[in-house]
């Protein structure tokens, strides 16, 4: 008993660490997401628009198209991207591992459901949420919980649903809410069930004594920050440039090209899984393409797959999840988008 008491006294719980983490979360999200989106909701209600399509007016030169899109894209997301990397590194050194294991570490459906719930305040795009999901996996969060958090950020974004209701109509927002929730929970649950967790079990988080031997909080955080940055950001930038060059072929804006057929439902579902966009950018994209003649069914497919995953975000998570899990996630999201669009054809 005396030995146990002395051990507990030697390593008291440091409340300032989770307190600091949640302070960064609240201040960061207020500055990057909550406060800007509050004003944007009034703009959407008054004008029934949140801006131009980020895909429109692509340069015919692929190199110029890649550069132009990268500039527009990164100007839109850089604050959220910085916040995502910051939170993804801080969660590894400030949040006790047992907290995450008790909530998101379970392989049962409870962990997946909690991951979806915890994603709601984040409102991040799939690429900005990816570093946070990678940090969660370093803390041994289950695949289901981390995937639900990652996909829930863009698909269940409350602000996006409000924008969508004012711009595209509340029927679109309702379909997005129901289908988005079903997609997040179904995909995360199936990946958790079908992919062996032990294949790439995350490295165990060291105990208090091991942490002490690795240095103080600041040095451990800098190591986590650098590792996360190096594993995610360079490939992120490269993938955005490549997709920027290909955008004109992925999403044709010519009048009447994308009609209301099963072929285009499947094509848009797949294209949406490949491309990368900022938060809520699917709304003006779909609005512009529908004005050019795109049918409702392909539009619904895009509204599910375009925000949910992208090639850059999947690549960013290549060291956090088994390759099979990422391929399966992309395929299942495309299938969910195709099913939602196909139901609109019935």
Language model regions located:
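Interfacial loop-to-helix junctions that mark the boundaries of transmembrane helices
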Residues: 10-14, 67-75, 170-179, 226-230, ...
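Alpha-helical transmembrane segments in multi-pass membrane proteins
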Residues: 76, 80, 84, 88, ...
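Juxtamembrane and boundary regions of transmembrane helices in multi-pass small-molecule transporters
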Residues: 16-40, 106, 111, 168-211, ...
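Alpha-helical transmembrane segments of multipass membrane proteins
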Residues: 88, 92, 183-191, 243, ...
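Intrinsically disordered, low-complexity non-transmembrane regions of multi-pass membrane transporters
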Residues: 1-23, 39-61, 196-224
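Membrane-interacting alpha-helical segments
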Residues: 60, 64-71, 75, 114, ...
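Membrane-interfacial helix-loop connectors
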Residues: 119-177, 251-325
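Transmembrane helical segments that form the transport core of multi-pass membrane transport proteins
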Residues: 55-56, 67, 84, 90-104, ...
């Amino acid at each position: 008993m005396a030995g146990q008491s002395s051990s507990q006294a030697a390593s008291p719980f440091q409340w300032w660490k989770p307190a600091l983490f949640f302070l960064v979360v609240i201040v960061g999200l207020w500055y990057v997401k909550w406060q800007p989106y509050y004003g944007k909701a009034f703009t959407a209600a008054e004008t029934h628009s949140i801006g131009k399509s980020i895909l429109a007016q692509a340069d015919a030169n692929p190199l110029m198209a890649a550069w132009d899109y990268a500039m527009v894209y990164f100007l839109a997301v850089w604050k959220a991207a910085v916040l995502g990397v910051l939170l993804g590194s801080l969660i590894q050194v400030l949040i006790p591992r047992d907290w995450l294991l008790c909530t998101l570490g379970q392989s049962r459906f409870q962990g997946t459901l909690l991951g979806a719930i915890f994603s709601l305040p984040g409102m991040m795009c799939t690429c900005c949420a990816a570093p946070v999901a990678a940090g969660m996996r370093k803390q041994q969060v289950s695949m289901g919980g981390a995937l639900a958090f990652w996909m829930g950020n863009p698909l269940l974004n409350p602000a996006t649903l409000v924008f969508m209701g004012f711009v595209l109509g509340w029927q679109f927002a309702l379909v997005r809410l129901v289908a988005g929730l079903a997609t997040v929970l179904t995909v995360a649950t199936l990946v958790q069930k079908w992919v062996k967790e032990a294949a790439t079990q995350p490295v165990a988080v060291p105990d208090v004594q091991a942490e002490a031997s690795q240095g103080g909080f600041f040095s451990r955080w800098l190591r986590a920050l650098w590792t996360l940055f190096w594993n995610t950001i360079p490939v992120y930038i490269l993938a955005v440039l490549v997709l920027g060059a290909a955008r004109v072929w992925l999403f044709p804006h010519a009048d009447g090209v994308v009609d209301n057929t099963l072929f285009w439902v499947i094509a848009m579902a797949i294209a949406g899984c490949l491309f990368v966009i900022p938060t809520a950018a699917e709304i003006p994209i779909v609005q512009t393409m529908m004005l050019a003649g795109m049918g409702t069914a392909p539009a619904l497919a895009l509204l599910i797959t375009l925000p949910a995953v992208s090639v850059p975000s999947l690549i960013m998570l290549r060291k956090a999840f088994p390759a099979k899990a990422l391929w399966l996630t992309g395929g299942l999201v495309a299938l969910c988008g195709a099913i939602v669009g196909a139901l609109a054809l019935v």
